[in-house]
């Protein structure tokens, strides 16, 4: 077993395709295929299962990938300490719903490690894209929420993709409005209060159902609905149209603006916000630090 073989395994797992991995590694496809075949033979396990669309990790492969990442991280650390002319570039990726605390936690991870160079990725995406990213190891972690309305459907989807959900905290739904909104002076807001105002939600593409919605309240309960793709547009419309959205209530003035405020929504429901990850995969130190940073921002 060589470090080169471990790098091949990690890259193929991230790409989900040997041809694409070979391009990223600047080697031929037969070279990658042969190296992984030799490794599987040596370790007496099947790491990848071949499919019509590419490759997926086997159960043994998932465990092996976690250990391979740890070994490569340790090598990166040693090279950084003992080889002045070689500076390894750490990698970490997370996919999340449009939560400001998820972005703040990402910032904390970068500041904590303060690396000379790095290649980190944060993706604010649609719910099904988050699940696909973590399933295909495009991202190590995903940040989503479960509620009484979506738990059954999403839990089945997570189980099917061999993902696990770890709850970070439970929140009661809140309404985000601008500080000049007619309802801004109320201590809490009811659904009846909101009927005359536009409801801003994030578009979910072909998965545009309440099960994949980022917002706790269904658009079916609102007369005026506007769907958007990004957070900046959503908050601009909240201000410009006196609209609203429904979320966890964890707000960041630095990211959302100081004229966006949060008010409790008067409903007997809750949101379980947490992270999703691949079962059996050992998390990197960056992923572990990110989870701790999330807890710090949400609790």
Tell what function each PLM region has.
Residues 160-166, 171-172, 233-281:
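Beta-alpha-beta core module
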Residues 135-139, 145, 204-261:
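Hydrophobic hinge/microswitch elements
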Residues 102-108, 151, 191, 195-219, ...:
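Secondary-structure junction motif
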Residues 157-173, 177-199:
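Flexible hinge/capping segments at coil-to-helix
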Residues 89-153:
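Central regulatory/effector-binding core of bacterial HTH transcription factors
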Residues 42-43, 64-86:
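Alpha-helical linker/hinge and terminal dimerization helices associated
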């Amino acid at each position: 077993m060589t470090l080169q073989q471990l790098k091949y395994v990690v890259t193929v797992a991230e790409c989900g395709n040997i041809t694409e991995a070979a391009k990223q590694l600047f080697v031929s496809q037969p070279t990658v295929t042969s190296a992984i075949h030799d490794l599987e033979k040596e370790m007496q396990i099947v790491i990848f299962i071949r499919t019509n669309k590419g490759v997926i990790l086997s159960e043994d492969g998932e465990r092996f990938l976690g250990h391979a990442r740890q070994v490569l991280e340790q090598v990166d650390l040693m090279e950084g300490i003992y080889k002045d002319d070689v500076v390894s570039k750490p990698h970490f990726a997370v996919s999340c719903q449009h939560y400001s605390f998820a972005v703040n936690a990402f910032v904390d991870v970068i500041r904590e490690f303060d690396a000379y160079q790095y290649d980190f990725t944060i993706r604010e995406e649609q719910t099904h894209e988050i699940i696909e990213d973590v399933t295909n190891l495009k991202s190590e972690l995903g940040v989503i929420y479960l509620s009484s309305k979506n738990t059954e459907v999403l839990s089945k989807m997570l189980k099917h993709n061999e993902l696990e959900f770890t709850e970070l905290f439970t929140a009661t739904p809140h309404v985000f409005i601008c500080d000049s909104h007619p309802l801004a002076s109320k201590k809490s807001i009811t659904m009846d209060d909101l009927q005359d105002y536009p409801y801003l939600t994030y578009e979910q593409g072909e998965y545009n159902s309440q099960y994949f919605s980022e917002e706790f309240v269904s658009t079916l309960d609102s007369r005026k609905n506007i769907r958007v793709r990004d957070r900046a547009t959503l908050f601009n419309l909240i201000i410009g149209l006196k609209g609203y959205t429904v979320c966890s209530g964890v707000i960041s003035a630095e990211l959302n603006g100081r004229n966006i405020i949060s008010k409790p929504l008067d409903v007997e429901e809750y949101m379980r916000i947490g992270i999703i990850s691949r079962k059996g995969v050992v998390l990197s130190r960056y992923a572990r630090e990110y989870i701790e940073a999330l807890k710090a921002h949400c609790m």
